[in-house]
Amino acid sequence: MNNIRKTHPLMKIVNSSFIDLPAPSNISSWWNFGSLLGICLIAQILTGLFLAMHYTSDTMTAFSSVTHICRDVNYGWLIRYLHANGASMFFICLFLHVGRGLYYGSYMFLETWNIGVLLLFAVMATAFMGYVLPWGQMSFWGATVITNLLSAIPYIGTNLVEWIWGGFSVDKATLTRFFAFHFILPFIVAALAGVHLLFLHETGSNNPSGLNSDTDKIPFHPYYTIKDILGALIMITALSSLVLFSPDMLGDPDNYIPANPLNTPPHIKPEWYFLFAYAILRSIPNKLGGVLALVLSIAILMIIPLLHTAKQRSMMFRPMSQCMFWILVADLFTLTWIGGQPVEHPFVVIGQLASMIYFMLILLIMPITSMIENQLLKW
């Protein structure tokens, strides 16, 4: 009798994806983040579902409904903070996952990589709209500032912004539609993640050496299932510690003040995971230029496969490229720091320099470094 997991129509999909999947024998812990992102997404959908049962998407009651969840609903505070800090864990895993792809040349799987970039955009859109829902000061003003950027689009900009707002300012219509989009987008993300996996399994995983690993494969289960469980336990421990000991550490205290269109907060800033892009946006004095730079700061990932000039796929054996990669990481930390600072000297200049270095590194310095390394191989 044939094994049911290999014959049952549903089970054989699971089997070929998570059990009998041939995986390289040498993939490191940097390959854990895909499964961690899956766990994050499931956790966010579940906690979000329970929050949606008690939340009301109306400007008069949204703030009170979130307070009600925290005070009156059984373990509502836990669900709310798991959801808010779960988003932070999601982005930590996302950034590490993308960084791994850049370092080890995983972007050479074009379809997988491009769907990954689409996923990044979708998750960022979801997180932005979720931040608007509690209807605190930072929710309202963040929504106003970011949606207003679309007015920089020539000719149709103003109409587009008013169409998104559903009126002449961020108001009840905006909040209601943001709630609807925030609810549906995670399911679109889940579907895209399925396609992401589908394309990945067409080629098989990359590995730290960047070499073909067809000659040395091991089954995913038990080797990588147990490894993923360990990674998941570490992440759950980190998230639990954050939620139970300092749930508001990553949030903005201004969001505990109900939204007031007549009172602008002194420093409008997004959640920490958008600060690097926000710093790039602010570093360009022109509105349209800033918006373009903001979009390009993420969209630039799509052209990275075209900028690959090295003879090896991975940076494992390329010390000069490694150096440039870590300078890029340091630059992103600098941008994140600047994004949270007020617009005054010396932060403006530091932000402009860091933004310039970011684009220069990706578009010019790293490809040239790879070409120099190619020449050094001949010596």
From Swiss-Prot:
Cofactor remark: Binds 2 heme b groups non-covalently.
Binding residue positions for a ubiquinone: H201
Gene3D superfamilies cross-referenced by the UniProt entry: Cytochrome Bc1 Complex, Chain C
This protein's record includes keyword Transmembrane: yes
Compartment(s) of residence: Mitochondrion inner membrane
GO biological process assignments: mitochondrial electron transport, ubiquinol to cytochrome c
Keywords: Electron transport, Heme, Iron, Membrane, Metal-binding, Mitochondrion, Mitochondrion inner membrane, Respiratory chain, Transmembrane, Transmembrane helix, Transport, Ubiquinone
Topology versus the membrane: Multi-pass membrane protein
One Pfam family recorded for the sequence: Cytochrome_B
Metal-binding listed as a keyword: yes
Membrane-spanning intervals of the chain: 33-53, 77-98, 113-133, 178-198, 226-246, 288-308, 320-340, 347-367
Assigned GO CC terms: mitochondrial inner membrane; respiratory chain complex III
Chain residues that bind heme b b562: H83, H182
Obligatory cofactor(s): heme b
Main localization of the protein described in the UniProt heading: mitochondrion
Positions of heme b b566 binding: H97, H196
Record text on subunit structure and interactions: The cytochrome bc1 complex contains 11 subunits: 3 respiratory subunits (MT-CYB, CYC1 and UQCRFS1), 2 core proteins (UQCRC1 and UQCRC2) and 6 low-molecular weight proteins (UQCRH/QCR6, UQCRB/QCR7, UQCRQ/QCR8, UQCR10/QCR9, UQCR11/QCR10 and a cleavage product of UQCRFS1). This cytochrome bc1 complex then forms a dimer.
UniProt miscellaneous comment: Heme 1 (or BL or b562) is low-potential and absorbs at about 562 nm, and heme 2 (or BH or b566) is high-potential and absorbs at about 566 nm.
Family of this protein: Belongs to the cytochrome b family.
Protein name per the record: Cytochrome b
Organism (species): Crocidura fuliginosa
Annotated gene: MT-CYB
